Design a protein with these regions (language model features):
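N-terminal leader/linker segments that precede catalytic domains of diphosphate-processing enzymes
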Residues: 1-314
Length: 314
């Protein structure tokens, strides 16, 4: 099982609809991708060895770092603690993946301490060249940041969810989710390699697009969008993310009424379903919010509650 990271980029909308005045950025994985090919997902990926090198770790600001590391330390005592190498690796990988896939760089300028802006044509061109070199493996992410006098501030990413691939799957990831505000003066543009399309949508718009068959979503992405759809602004989302306790969620896959179902740890049928469980979690699960299962009905996933058979988006 490989450690991985996912980043939900946020930006305010220009709409007058105050019920959901923010958007999230979704990228479409290339069809040839071995994992979630053709799906619309949030930017992210697995940790690379280079994300945990000394040169990469030195680029992480110590200001606020210890508190950030403690926050992402799992409360599940049956799993290894999140040490400095993994914590900083997650931060580096998060920023690297967002830059590679979306062209947004969540970094600060060393000489000023200000959030990076790339709206100047010369700067934008230079950073596109760096992005191309990274894609070709001609330089490391640490080399790039060092050359541009940039550093990573943990405050720019807020941890809010932890999903682990079910034990029955061959390709498994231990993924931590973060939310981040897209810096002013930067623009999200996909790389046309790992990602072939990118869209900004409010959570409700993204779910609607899925229901209409315009985009494909995996169950974790659908659940995250549903969780976010109850918020009204970027600041509201970040405050919610910073204030919630995060415990690992490792679903089980079973069959309910002849339908494939992904059962979350607080589902009444979870314990009776075959599959690995995380030991040491309190019951009920501390993150027992919303639906308890995601059911494949026809060609689409629907979030359901065992006690009330109605979908979240009905």
């Amino acid at each position: 099982m490989k450690p991985a990271t996912t980043v939900v980029l946020l930006r305010p909308t220009k709409s007058n609809d105050r019920r959901e005045a923010f958007e999230v950025f979704l990228v479409k994985r290339a069809a040839r991708s071995g994992f979630m090919g053709g799906m619309y997902v949030f930017p992210g990926g697995k940790l690379d060895p280079a994300d945990q090198t000394d040169s990469a770790k030195k680029l992480v600001s110590q200001s606020g770092y210890l508190r950030w590391q403690e926050r992402i330390h799992s409360s599940d005592f049956s799993r290894p603690a999140v040490d400095e190498a993994l914590a900083k690796g997650l931060l580096v990988a998060s920023v690297r993946e967002v830059f590679e896939e979306a062209g947004v760089l969540l970094a600060k300028v060393g000489s000023t301490g200000q959030v990076l802006q790339t709206d100047v044509t010369e700067t934008k061109t230079r950073f596109l060249e760096w992005r191309a070199r990274l894609a070709k493996g001609e330089c490391s992410f640490a080399d790039f940041l060092t050359a541009e006098d940039l550093y990573l501030d943990p405050v720019m990413l807020t941890y809010f969810a932890h999903w682990i691939t079910p034990s029955r799957e061959k390709r498994r990831y231990d993924t931590r989710f973060f939310v981040a505000y897209q810096p002013i003066g930067q623009e999200a543009v996909v790389d046309d390699h790992e990602a072939v399309d990118g869209v900004w949508r409010t959570p409700k718009e993204a779910i609607s697009d899925y229901r209409q068959g315009d985009i494909a979503l995996a169950p974790p992405t659908l659940r995250i969008l549903e969780d976010l759809s109850g918020h009204i602004s970027v600041s509201h989302v970040i405050d919610w993310a910073a204030g919630r306790d995060v415990w690992p969620i490792m679903p089980k896959v079973g069959t309910v009424n002849d339908q494939i179902a992904i059962l979350l740890p607080w589902d009444p049928g979870f314990e009776a379903t075959d599959g690995e469980s995380i030991l040491g979690l309190p019951h009920p699960h501390p993150n027992a919010e919303g639906p308890s299962r995601v059911v494949l009905e026809g060609q689409q996933w629907h979030s359901r509650n065992d006690f009330a058979q109605s979908s979240v988006d009905d």
